[in-house]
C-alpha cells in the first residue's frame, strides 16, 4: 500500500519551521508490502519520500520532468525554504517562462532517501525500535536513491519522464536513471558531474566526515537522543566542502585579501578577512538546516558511485543501445567535477550509440555555477528541452 499525505516540516527534530504555504510538500509512504531493496542487501520498509511538484501534468502524462537535487539540496526547488525562508535553490531555472517552465512542464523533485527534509533517513525513527535510526540506518547508494524515485514516479502514474535533470550529486542520479531505466527517460540533462567519484573527491568527503565524527557532540551518531548536535564538526565540514564549490578566480573577485569591518589585522584568530567571515557564515547557517548523519550517508553514497563497475569496467556498455537524448554540461572553472570528467561521459555515450550534445560553459564561478545566474547555461537548458519537446511531439497546448 502507498499513502500520500502533506507534511509540515523536515525529519530532523531541531527543525521546527512550518512548511511554505504554496506549494505544500507531499510525502509518499510505502508500507512493508513495498520495501525498497538497497544495494547493501537490506530491504527498507516502511519508508517515505517527501516531494514537491510544480505545474500541471498533461492528460498524456508526457510533460513530466524529474529534478534530482545535489548533496545539500532538497525538494524545495522553486518555493521558499520552510526552514531558512530563502528562495528555492533553483528558482533561477524553474518557474513560469524559465528554462524549466512550470506553465509547460510538470516538475517533480523529491528529497533523496537518506536525506533530512521529510524522506526516510538516519534522523527518522526506526519503526522496529522506536528510536532514531542514527548509524543503524543502512548505508545507501545513488542507485538506491533512484530506485526510490522510480517508486514515487510509479505512484504518480507516470510511465516515461520527458526529462531528468540535475547537477553534481543530482547529475549522478540523472546518469543512474538512464542506466537503470533507459526506457523511462526520454531526455537527460546531467550537469557538472561524472560517472564515478574521483579519489580527490572521496578524500574531501572523508575530511568532512572526520570533522563531524570528531565533534564530541556527535555522540557516535546518537546526538538526537542525547539532545546535542555536532554543530562545530558539521560546520567545518561545510566550510571545507564549500571551498571546492568555488574557484580561485571567484574567491579573488569576491573577496581578495580585503579585511572584514576593519582596516588593520587584529593579530588574533578572529575572522580578519572577508573570506574567513564568509566561510564561517556558510558553516553556521548550514547546521541549522541539515542533519549531520545525513551528511555522512549522502557523501558516502557519492563516494560509492561508479557506473562502469557494474559493467565490467566498460562505461560505454552501460549506455549501449539507449534511446535517451543527452545534453552534458560542464563549467571551465569547476575543479570538483572538471570538464575532463564530462568529456569522458560524452565519449562513453558516443561509443554506446547515444544521441548526445556537449556544452562546456566559460565561467569563473566554479562548480556552483549550475546554481547561479549563468545566462549561457540557461540558454543551453532551454534550447535542449525545446528541441527534445519538438522531437517528442510536445506541442505548447499539450504541455
Curated annotation (Swiss-Prot):
**SUPFAM superfamilies from the xrefs?**
alpha/beta-Hydrolases
Gene Ontology terms describing biological process: homoserine metabolic process; methionine biosynthetic process
EC number of the protein: 2.3.1.31
Q: Which domain of life is it from?
A: Bacteria
Gene Ontology terms, cellular component aspect? cytoplasm
Reactions catalysed according to its record: L-homoserine + acetyl-CoA = O-acetyl-L-homoserine + CoA
UniProt domain AB hydrolase-1: residue ranges = 63-372
- At the top of the EC hierarchy, this enzyme's class is transferase
Principal location: cytoplasm
Instruction: Tell me its family.
Output: Belongs to the AB hydrolase superfamily. MetX family.
What is the name of the protein in this document? Homoserine O-acetyltransferase
The major lineage groups are: Bacteria, Pseudomonadati, Pseudomonadota, Alphaproteobacteria, Hyphomicrobiales
Gene that this polypeptide is encoded by: metXA
Amino acid at each position: 500500500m502507498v499513502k500520500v499525505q502533506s507534511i509540515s516540516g523536515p525529519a530532523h527534530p531541531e527543525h521546527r519551521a512550518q512548511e511554505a504555504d504554496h506549494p505544500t510538500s507531499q510525502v509518499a509512504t510505502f508500507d512493508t508490502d513495498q520495501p525498497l531493496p538497497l544495494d547493501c542487501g537490506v530491504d527498507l520498509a516502511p519508508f517515505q519520500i517527501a516531494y514537491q511538484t510544480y505545474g500541471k501534468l498533461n492528460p498524456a502524462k508526457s510533460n513530466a520532468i524529474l529534478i534530482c537535487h545535489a548533496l545539500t539540496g532538497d525538494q524545495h526547488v522553486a518555493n521558499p525554504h520552510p526552514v531558512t525562508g530563502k528562495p528555492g535553490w533553483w528558482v533561477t531555472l524553474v518557474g513560469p517562462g524559465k528554462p524549466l517552465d512550470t506553465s509547460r512542464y510538470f516538475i517533480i523533485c523529491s528529497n533523496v532517501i537518506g536525506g533530512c527534509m521529510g524522506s526516510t533517513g538516519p534522523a527518522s525513527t526506526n519503526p522496529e525500535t522506536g528510536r532514531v535510526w542514527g548509524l543503524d540506518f543502512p548505508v545507501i547508494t545513488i542507485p538506491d536513491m533512484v530506485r526510490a524515485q522510480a517508486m514515487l514516479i510509479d505512484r504518480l502514474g507516470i510511465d516515461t519522464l520527458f526529462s531528468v535533470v540535475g547537477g553534481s550529486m543530482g547529475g549522478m542520479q540523472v546518469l543512474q536513471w538512464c542506466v537503470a531505466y533507459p526506457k523511462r527517460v526520454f531526455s537527460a540533462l546531467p550537469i557538472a558531474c561524472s560517472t564515478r567519484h574521483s579519489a580527490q573527491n572521496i578524500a574531501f568527503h572523508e575530511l568532512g566526515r572526520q570533522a563531524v565524527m570528531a565533534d564530541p557532540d556527535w555522540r557516535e551518531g546518537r546526538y538526537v537522543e542525547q539532545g546535542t548536535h555536532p554543530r562545530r564538526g558539521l560546520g567545518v565540514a561545510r566550510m571545507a566542502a564549500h571551498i571546492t564549490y568555488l574557484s580561485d578566480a571567484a574567491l579573488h573577485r569576491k573577496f581578495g585579501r580585503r579585511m572584514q569591518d576593519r582596516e588593520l589585522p587584529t593579530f588574533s584568530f578572529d575572522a580578519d578577512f572577508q573570506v574567513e567571515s564568509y566561510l564561517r557564515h556558510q558553516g553556521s547557517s548550514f547546521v541549522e538546516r541539515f542533519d549531520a548523519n545525513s551528511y555522512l550517508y549522502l557523501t558516502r553514497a557519492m563516494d560509492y558511485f561508479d557506473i562502469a563497475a557494474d559493467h565490467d569496467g566498460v562505461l560505454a556498455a552501460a549506455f549501449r543501445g539507449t534511446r535517451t537524448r543527452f545534453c552534458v554540461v560542464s563549467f571551465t572553472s569547476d575543479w570538483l567535477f572538471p570538464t575532463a570528467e564530462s568529456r569522458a561521459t560524452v565519449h562513453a555515450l558516443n561509443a554506446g550509440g547515444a544521441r548526445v550534445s556537449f556544452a562546456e560553459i566559460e565561467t569563473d564561478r566554479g562548480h556552483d555555477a549550475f546554481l547561479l545566474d549563468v545566462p549561457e547555461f540557461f540558454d543551453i537548458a532551454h534550447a535542449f528541452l525545446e528541441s527534445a519537446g519538438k522531437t517528442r511531439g510536445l506541442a505548447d497546448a499539450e504541455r
